[in-house]
């Protein structure tokens, strides 16, 4: 397995579309997310509105993204998330929506209740946002970097994503992103928020 959610229900994801989940910590359920049972999933997040069902989002290789509902110790059938991009069409002076051409990997995903938004990050600075806990579509955003983004978290009213080459970018809504100074060129592989500060780890002991 390559990743596990940071809150209940605890869901681990990995190669061959496998996942395992538990709420109690003692009984684990095992299944497959789908996508031909061939995809490696690299990240997983848990989201809830405080009043509705708890949802799980898994992201992985080849632009794979899927969502399911957690019910007790079980996970419902996984629903693939469609990827879209919006482009300005000068001839008609409006923005139109198209199917995304992104085929790279996703590495991390996070949900933030106050923003009502999932944020997924991946190769070549790719960021996709999904507004609404149960939405079935994700839209690409401009990150301002071409570095692969390896992880994302939320804290202090900001989404923070980290990646290769010391890349750190931030957004207060998941849509508009700006660079942060990291003072390193080492690849940054993960980030957490402990309620008081962000902690980032990376290559070469960073």
Where does each model-flagged region fall?
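Residue-level hotspots at or immediately adjacent to binding/recognition sites across diverse folds
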Residues: 1-206
């Amino acid at each position: 397995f390559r990743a596990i959610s940071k809150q209940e229900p605890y869901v681990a994801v990995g190669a061959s579309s496998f996942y395992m989940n538990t709420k109690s910590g003692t009984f684990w359920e095992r299944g497959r997310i789908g996508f031909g049972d061939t995809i490696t999933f690299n990240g997983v997040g848990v989201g809830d509105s405080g009043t509705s069902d708890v949802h799980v989002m898994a992201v992985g290789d080849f632009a794979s993204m899927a969502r399911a509902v957690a019910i007790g110790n079980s996970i419902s059938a996984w629903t693939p998330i469609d990827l879209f991009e919006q482009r300005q069409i000068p001839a008609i002076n409006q923005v139109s929506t198209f199917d995304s051409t992104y085929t790279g990997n996703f590495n991390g995903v996070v949900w933030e209740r106050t923003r009502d938004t999932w944020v997924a990050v991946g190769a070549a600075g790719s960021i996709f946002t999904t507004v609404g806990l149960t939405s079935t579509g994700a839209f690409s955003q401009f990150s301002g970097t071409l570095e692969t983004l390896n992880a994302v978290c939320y804290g202090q009213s900001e989404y923070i994503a980290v990646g290769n080459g010391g890349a750190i970018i931030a957004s207060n809504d998941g849509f508009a992103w700006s660079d942060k100074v990291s003072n390193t060129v080492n690849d940054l592989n993960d980030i957490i928020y402990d309620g008081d500060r962000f902690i980032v780890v990376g290559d070469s002991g960073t």
